A protein has these predicted regions:
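Non-transmembrane "mature" sequence context
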Residues: 1-113
């Protein structure tokens, strides 16, 4: 993936998800310095980090259909009963995105709107 494409994806996550740079790093289980190096082309994400980055971008896109950026950020960092009290951010950071994706599918179907 090119530097400009990677930067665009990270910017999209930050913009649509209302997520700060350090939170992007937290969600991807890396450091803010590493994310900065990805954005400037000084480094490339490992496959696992790239997969999480792409999933996080997809999630931010989906949440933007329902929420403003500040609301999406709140959704990501708040405990949810439908996730057994877990925060989506914690599940993303540990690679357990399947549960979140199922919840997003339910939101899209109108089950919890």
């Amino acid at each position: 993936m090119t530097t400009s494409a990677l930067k665009k994806r990270i910017d999209n996550i930050r913009e649509k998800g209302g997520i700060k740079s350090r939170e992007v790093a937290q969600l991807l289980d890396t450091t803010p310095q590493t994310v900065s190096r990805w954005q400037t082309g000084q480094a490339s994400p490992q496959p696992k980090s790239l997969e999480r980055l792409l999933t996080l971008e997809w999630l931010a896109d989906q949440l933007s259909q329902f929420y403003e950026p500040d609301e999406a950020r709140l959704w990501l960092f708040s405990p949810h009963a439908l996730l057994s009290g877990s925060r989506p951010a914690d599940l993303i950071a540990t690679g357990r995105t399947d549960e979140i994706l199922r919840l997003i599918d339910q939101l899209q179907s109108g089950a919890y709107t």
